[in-house]
Design a protein with these regions (language model features):
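Basic, Lys/Arg- and aromatic-enriched nucleic-acid-binding interface segment
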Residues: 89-109, 120-183, 190-191
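Structural motif corresponding to the C-terminal cap of alpha-helices
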Residues: 38, 59, 63, 83-91, ...
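Short amphipathic alpha-helical coiled-coil/interface segments
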Residues: 4, 108-111
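Active-site catalytic microenvironments for nucleophilic, acid-base chemistry
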Residues: 6-14, 37, 82, 86, ...
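N-terminal DNA-binding module of tyrosine recombinases/phage integrases
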Residues: 1-78
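Short, conserved phosphate-binding/catalytic loop or strand-edge motifs used
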Residues: 69-84, 130-135
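Short, basic/aromatic-rich helical patch in the C-terminal catalytic core of site-specific tyrosine
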Residues: 76, 111, 115, 180
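C-terminal flanking helix
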Residues: 56, 112-115, 119
Length: 192
């Protein structure tokens, strides 16, 4: 009876789906094709490199040789668990060889897009990344300078015109470093 129910579920999954001959390709072959034919023409080079990194270092070594039609949500969960514990190539002082939750979320974003495209191209009936629980982001408590600490810090850097202006702007405007680095002189109003 359990086998019959499983068979019925599988049949209903594929009902109305006309899988193509390419359904036999491996996940690695699909990811290469997806990157070159569908992604590369429509994204910036830096985005493409980020996608390639996730695929080459995390997805393909673990699942690349498996037929795309055989990838299951359990495979995806195992992938995320494995990279969560052993995904970093070079050891990080804070994380060791583990990937952070936000890195796994970015990896999931890439994998999810690729598998959505496989569904649209009738390579698979459903996206196995759908509904997989992702690790929660760990909130790192922010260290905020007190008034006395802020005054001491500004006293120390006051002697250096470049750094004083940079940090004074950062601390008083509430901007992030990247936003400060992108400022132009035209962004400043000398009167105020």
């Amino acid at each position: 009876k359990a086998l019959a129910e499983k068979l019925h579920r599988e049949m209903s999954t594929y009902r109305g789906v006309d899988l193509t001959e390419n359904s036999r390709m491996t996940l690695g072959e699909w990811l290469d094709q997806w990157l070159e034919e569908l992604v590369a023409p429509s994204v910036r080079e830096s985005t493409l490199e980020g996608y390639r990194h996730h695929i080459q270092y995390h997805i393909k070594p673990r699942l690349g040789s498996k037929p795309i039609s055989k990838i299951t949500p359990d495979d995806v969960r195992k992938l995320y668990r494995d990279v969560q514990n052993h995904g970093r190539i070079r050891e990080d002082p804070e994380y060791g060889h583990a990937l952070s939750a936000s890195s796994i979320r970015r990896l999931h974003g890439v994998f999810h897009l690729a598998m959505d495209a496989a569904v649209r191209d009738n390579l698979i009936a459903r996206n196995p990344t759908e509904g997989v629980t992702l690790p929660r982001k760990t909130a790192v408590p922010k260290q905020i300078l007190g008034d006395a600490q802020l005054e001491r810090f500004l006293d120390v850097i006051r002697e250096d015109d470049v750094w004083h202006d940079f940090f004074y702007t950062e601390l008083t405007a509430g901007l992030r470093r990247g936003e400060i680095c992108g400022l132009q002189w035209s962004d400043f109003d000398e009167a105020h």
